[in-house]
Amino acid sequence: MVSTMASGDVRGYVGWKDIVMFHPVGDISLNGMTRRIFSNAVRAMAGMLREDKGEQEAQKNQIALTVFGVVQPCAEYAKPLLEEKGYEVMVFHTSGTGGMALEELVKQGMIDAVLDISTTEVTDEVVGGVLTAGPLRMEAAGVMGIPQVIIPGAIDLVNFKTPDTVPAKWKDRVFYRHTPHITLMRTNVEESALLGQVFAQKINQAKGPSLLLIPLRGFSAYDSPQGPQAINLQGGPAARPWFWPEADQAFCQALKENLDASRVRYHELSMHINEPSFAEMAVQELDKMINGQ
């Protein structure tokens, strides 16, 4: 696609698909510069069409693995463990489009199992952040009946851009400046309880083996007694720390109260999500389900 919109927010055009965009620099017209850009775009397309795919490799089981910055250690531990077991791993960054791509590929039958480490997109959909993957996130694997291990990774935060993008109704909440362009808001007790209910409603639809694996010592790198100092929206010290065990407990309690135990297993571990042993347990459990154990 050759478009002057290629230099801006292209989510509406690209979405979750592998679309290549060329920015023509000038508006669409024929001149020396745009002719060269159009020519480059055509050559790129021709090259992709002529590519000799050769012999296809023997198909391995495709495992979808979700990741987000604050739970990246968990994903980095899990990925090689899955590969050692002979699986091919597709990694999805849960920034909205990543979760959309995951759900769509599962529905197309291209994914055999899901290790859903980062479910932060559900938080943004429920609470009102900017990285939502839509209302159907975390449902396709259950509907398709494929094995899934679901972890409440990064559900302790709601994603916004710069501080001025945070709605005024939340100006007195607890925040953390992840980068100059990413502002995180801590989920409170009420929101966490609502998330527990939503998780249960989604996972109760599962037609295949499903496990909720809960790291009781924290859902993200920030969700820990050793986590960073929280701030207010103006950048000063927050009224309370980011680590909020009562909020995490509210999520777990609501989840257990609403979960259909006849369809979904629930397992709590006295570990932090980013401990290597937690990733090992998640991989072991998914491997067992794939192999019918």
Question: Where on the chain are the PLM-derived regions?
Answer:
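Short loop/turn segments immediately following the C-termini of beta-strands
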Residues: 153
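Active-site gating loops and adjacent loop-to-helix segments of metal-dependent hydrolytic enzymes
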Residues: 169-178
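Metallocofactor- and cofactor-centric catalytic cores in central/energy metabolism, strongly enriched
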Residues: 1-143, 148-150, 160, 184-293
